[in-house]
Amino acid sequence: MTMEKGMSSGEGLPSRSSQVSAGKITAKELETKQSYKEKRGGFVLVHAGAGYHSESKAKEYKHVCKRACQKAIEKLQAGALATDAVTAALVELEDSPFTNAGMGSNLNLLGEIECDASIMDGKSLNFGAVGALSGIKNPVSVANRLLCEGQKGKLSAGRIPPCFLVGEGAYRWAVDHGIPSCPPNIMTTRFSLAAFKRNKRKLELAERVDTDFMQLKKRRQSSEKENDSGTLDTVGAVVVDHEGNVAAAVSSGGLALKHPGRVGQAALYGCGCWAENTGAHNPYSTAVSTSGCGEHLVRTILARECSHALQAEDAHQALLETMQNKFISSPFLASEDGVLGGVIVLRSCRCSAEPDSSQNKQTLLVEFLWSHTTESMCVGYMSAQDGKAKTHISRLPPGAVAGQSVAIEGGVCRLESPVN
């Protein structure tokens, strides 16, 4: 087992306003001061997938992660809910043609796009998800709307509101609730169509020569590198707002050439994402979003496993042990040659301000980590105090074998927190 602990630190203390000299304050200065005070804090960590990210497309992956972070922080600064902020980040990731989510998603065996997405609110513990959804540009928006509608209580005649919808039913529900549809030709990009044609030809050739399943599997894995297109790049984000509320979301187009109707981890409870505020039995608020081979993540319920593990004192060690013992060495995946997946996690807790600080304020201590068994994982992160987002493509160390090795990195930051 190979482990990497290159701490890409995001330590950033809240900036302090400079002292104002005595004298008159203009109306413009007063307005500026008021708008500054009205801005809320928070932190976001996003990923553009665990899979294979070529050097040639590194710039595009990092750029979309930066934009996603900025969208989430803008929401948090405006006082939006953590769920709305994490949704804003995911919408930006879904709209990129370089990610396997929303627009440009992998095509299934019939050449169609079917998307999965889910979101969880750490404060209410409510959850919303869609699976095998076609015709909607941003599946995470439907998942978030399901979550919001579910919080309103029972429907007419005492009916229980749905939290998870699939296929045509999910599409009709979205349209009925004002979410616009999107024609298939808009959702499909030239990149996804070209990849579909290449993969389809290889599949047809394999079937003609009666290639067995294992040979076909190896062909598919190698084609990811040859075509410069990772098929496991589910996208996701985790957020904590200035009050310490957390949220997590995930979105995916699924595996290339998947069977129509297949639903992956991105739509399933405890598998794609998890968020849970601090409580009587939880000293930390935690948020998790996963990526990788959906079937592997489903059978290990990895998102929830990681969240529970993060209640330990040492977050880094807890996540490493979870990836090793609950994922790579999981008895539920004993028949797999390589276990492919990745996670981004954050945990937060309230604590006193820095010891050398003269201000009697509480802060939110936010620890954030990412870990993967795939060859690479692209992440971005940003706090409300940062001028811009930081991005990074994490890779397994030289000589490490994907599916059998673990890379883990992360950092820490402090956010001002209102005292309750």
Curated annotation (Swiss-Prot):
A GO CC annotation given for this chain: cytoplasm
Keyword Protease: yes
InterPro entries found in the cross-reference section: Ntn_hydrolases_N (IPR029055), Peptidase_T2 (IPR000246), Taspase1 (IPR037464)
EC number assigned by the record: 3.4.25.-
Disordered, as annotated region: 1-23
Active site: T234
Biological process annotations from GO: positive regulation of DNA-templated transcription; protein maturation; proteolysis
GO molecular function: identical protein binding; threonine-type endopeptidase activity
Keyword Hydrolase: yes
Function: Protease responsible for KMT2A/MLL1 processing and activation. It also activates KMT2D/MLL2. Through substrate activation, it controls the expression of HOXA genes, and the expression of key cell cycle regulators including CCNA1, CCNB1, CCNE1 and CDKN2A.
Protein name: Threonine aspartase 1
Organism in which the protein naturally occurs: Homo sapiens (Human)
Taxonomic lineage of the native organism: Eukaryota, Metazoa, Chordata, Craniata, Vertebrata
